[in-house]
């Protein structure tokens, strides 16, 4: 039998905690026998003293085991269970293409996703722009969609990693969010509860990333890869660029529109294609669905070219109670803003840098995101036709097209877009889209 305050004292004094102590504390969070003050105290001691790798693995596993862990054995699936997690950014719509692409190649993708908060968009919000789309199917329906379609994208239910919800809420108000062991456990507890065989992490780097520096992004990627593999899930990570909006659009309905056009081959933004392909390759390799990089890329290109990936996306939408002909008639189903017009730079120049976080906040100010978790979202608004780093812009060549529902919010977003762009007379240095692959 342990005492919560003795566990806090031990960590406060810089000593490593045992697996049993960590499990006791996490179960106490779940069962409401550990107080908010005690959660805050432990979070702060971890923030200052860090955790050893065995502690990190124990924390992650205890948080995973605080709720239901999905078990797929009874379905006798004929392929691996694989997923992707992104630390979030702006215009990061990869999940909507990646899930169907991997499923079309023989994988099963039980993706439990999140909502947007602050400047980062949320996959669930994007999907809810589709009329009728149900992000909370019951357990049996979720399993059936995975078995029949190969991919489902759903929200976190209260039975998955419940200790994380309470732990995170306390961290959020006690300046202990940015602790690598705590971030790692929070991300992985939910992902490992999916019962995966393999996972790929997309850790963003740059002005729109969660972590403020390349070094911290790399540290987080390394920590997640180490802990996930230590917990028995084959995991790799890619460090990818978020110094500019990833897709050509940012918002909800506008990104779904871009995802469908990507899958059907109507238009594929080159940077979005590169990141999506790289992540899918990792999933195919880790899941044993391809023998090497070239084989994986050939398989993925084939399911894009022959329409199989687009077909899987359409079947997922229908299975999750969206329209049965969504891929064919997406434009008639997705909400459109009443006011769509371009925003121009006030002078001529080359875009040498952009504040991607500020561009994400421009979408929020249009109503397309949340400042607080309880905020409602306007699915129709956003940015399209985003200019890229190195583009020449002037009073004729726009920075973006802003989709708003009134003149006032259009004007505010226009001001935010203009001030997020740095113009100069020479092109910026070209940086990679994928910086680094991290394995154990």
Curated annotation (Swiss-Prot):
GO CC field: cytosol
InterPro entries for the chain: Glycosyl_Trfase_fam3, Glycosyl_Trfase_fam3_N_dom, Glycosyl_Trfase_fam3_N_dom_sf, Nuc_phospho_transferase, PYNP-like_C_sf, PYNP_C, Pyrmidine_PPas_bac/euk, Pyrmidine_PPase_CS
Entry-linked Gene3D superfamilies: Nucleoside phosphorylase/phosphoribosyltransferase catalytic domain, Pyrimidine nucleoside phosphorylase-like, C-terminal domain, Transferase, Pyrimidine Nucleoside Phosphorylase, Chain C
GO BP of this protein: pyrimidine nucleobase metabolic process; thymidine metabolic process
EC top class named in words: transferase
UniProt-recorded Gene Ontology molecular function terms: 1,4-alpha-oligoglucan phosphorylase activity; thymidine phosphorylase activity
The keyword Zinc-finger appears for this protein: no
Protein keywords: Glycosyltransferase, Transferase
Catalysis: reaction(s): thymidine + phosphate = 2-deoxy-alpha-D-ribose 1-phosphate + thymine
Pathway: Pyrimidine metabolism; dTMP biosynthesis via salvage pathway; dTMP from thymine: step 1/2
EC number: 2.4.2.4
Pfam families, sorted: Glycos_trans_3N, Glycos_transf_3, PYNP_C
Function: The enzymes which catalyze the reversible phosphorolysis of pyrimidine nucleosides are involved in the degradation of these compounds and in their utilization as carbon and energy sources, or in the rescue of pyrimidine bases for nucleotide synthesis.
Subunit record text: Homodimer.
Record-stated family: Belongs to the thymidine/pyrimidine-nucleoside phosphorylase family.
UniProt-recorded name of the protein: Thymidine phosphorylase
Source organism (scientific name): Serratia proteamaculans (strain 568)
Gene designation: deoA
